[in-house]
């Protein structure tokens, strides 16, 4: 069988735990902090799903919506709107926090509207 790599983008508001999820999935140790702006560029890591399938996990900067207000938010939008980007996701995982679930759902619905298969993770 041919090896396959699935691209999984971790997306969410700033400071909801995207990088913590990334570190758990990849075994890497990217810096985390209890304030926005820690991740300002996309980071990638690989995790093995089974004998022939790997997942390329893409940790993206925090954004509140797909209407960019900053350079790091623009990183998210440029990836999600460019199907020719080498990291265009097969699956988007929107990481949210239960305390601000309603605010986080705006981003979730915007990504769903792009017709990218999307999962919601409540951290």
Give a label for each model feature.
Residues 48-51, 75-123:
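Conserved C-terminal guanine-recognition region of P-loop GTPase G domains, centered on the G4
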């Amino acid at each position: 069988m041919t090896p396959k790599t699935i691209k999984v983008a971790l997306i969410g508001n700033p400071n909801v735990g995207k990088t913590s999820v990334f570190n758990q999935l990849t075994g890497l140790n990217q810096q985390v902090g209890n304030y926005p702006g820690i991740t300002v560029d996309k980071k990638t890591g690989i995790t093995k799903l089974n004998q022939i399938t790997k997942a390329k996990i893409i940790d993206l900067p925090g954004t509140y919506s797909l209407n960019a207000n900053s350079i790091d938010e623009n990183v998210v939008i440029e990836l999600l709107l460019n199907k020719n980007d080498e990291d265009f996701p097969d699956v988007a995982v929107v990481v949210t926090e239960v305390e601000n679930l309603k605010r986080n759902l705006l981003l979730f619905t915007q990504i769903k509207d792009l017709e990218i298969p999307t999962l919601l993770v409540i951290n």
